[in-house]
């Protein structure tokens, strides 16, 4: 039982250290094309094979404006409509705020776009975000992380994914064998 406890402690330490190391994919690109609108917050990331996106844009908005969030890849196009409920107006002015969490996407997603338009105008791209990959080390999404690491030629993500998956299998086998051996002698 002591080796299993030591392995569990090492696994927790490894998971915490792996998440604290900055990844080369942690690049956030912000393009501001107008003096009337300003992107104040722009974050996006992958977690458990799903896209999470958070941001805020302020400026000269009216209730006729709306923001659309688009997911762009070579083989996948999707537009998420941020509803009017995210439109706010207070003493600081008008702003849009969005927090999209848990939108399932394939491993081929390259970028997330924010477009702003009025009900009758053409949408214009105001910001873009390259999603960072945040590991979750669950067996549900092992295939997604393997495909993403091979697609991006990210060998660090590939080896980290394989190492953690194999480590979790070893711990599972040790726990199973330890419990069955203990039950046999009771």
UniProtKB/Swiss-Prot annotation:
The chain crosses the membrane at residues 161-181. It comes from the Viruses. It is found in: Host endoplasmic reticulum membrane. Retains, but does not degrade MHC class I heterodimers in the endoplasmic reticulum during the immediate-early period of virus infection, thereby impairing their transport and maturation. Forms a complex with beta-2-microglobulin-associated class I heavy chains, which accumulate in the ER. In consequence, infected cells are masked for immune recognition by cytotoxic T-lymphocytes. Residues 182-186 are cytoplasmic. GO terms for cellular component: host cell endoplasmic reticulum membrane; membrane. It comes from Human cytomegalovirus (strain Towne). Keywords: Disulfide bond, Early protein, Glycoprotein, Host endoplasmic reticulum, Host membrane, Host-virus interaction, Immunoglobulin domain, Lectin, Mannose-binding, Membrane, Signal, Transmembrane, Transmembrane helix, Viral immunoevasion. The lineage of its organism: Viruses, Duplodnaviria, Heunggongvirae, Peploviricota, Herviviricetes. Monomer. Residues 21-160 are lumenal. Belongs to the cytomegalovirus US2 family. The keyword Hydrolase does not apply. The signal sequence is not cleaved. Pfam families: Cytomega_US3. This is Membrane glycoprotein US3.
